[in-house]
């Protein structure tokens, strides 16, 4: 046996036994609605994995606050929309709202983080008005 490979081979069974984190991502953010509809803000999550993702106890933190209740499952290829004001959202979109978040997304920039039930970061998005965000993202 090659002695340089030995440390890697010892760690191999451990690495193979660690389950992969679900691939749920923050897919889309609508943070800057017209002034008269500031509560139209929403966040879309997507599960691109071939398996459903149990997102029970997962939270959105930093810019907004939301926690998924027990028995929350995002199907394979599925989407869920969370909004600041589900009633206002329903006036403009046909999609069903999966929950209402607290606080507001910053109009000129913010960070949104998705953490699992153990507090581990699953995905994080930071946005703002500068590059690489196009000016048209602000409705200009």
Please identify what each model-predicted range represents.
Residues 1-5:
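Positively charged n-region of N-terminal signal peptides that target proteins for export
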Residues 20-140:
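Activation on beta-sandwich/Ig-like modules and their edge loops
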């Amino acid at each position: 046996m090659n002695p340089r490979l030995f440390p890697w081979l010892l760690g191999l069974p451990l690495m193979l036994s660690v389950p992969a984190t679900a691939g749920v991502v923050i897919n889309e953010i609508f943070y800057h609605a017209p002034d008269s509809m500031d509560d139209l803000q929403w966040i879309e999550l997507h599960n691109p994995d071939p398996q459903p993702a149990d997102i029970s106890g997962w939270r959105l933190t930093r810019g907004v606050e939301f926690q998924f209740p027990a028995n929350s499952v995002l199907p394979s290829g599925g989407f869920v929309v969370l909004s600041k004001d589900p009633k206002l959202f329903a006036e403009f979109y046909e999609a069903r709202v999966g929950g209402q978040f607290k606080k507001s997304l910053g109009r000129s920039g913010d960070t949104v983080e998705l953490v699992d039930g153990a507090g581990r970061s699953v995905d994080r998005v930071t946005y703002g008005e500068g590059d690489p965000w196009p000016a048209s993202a602000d409705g200009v």
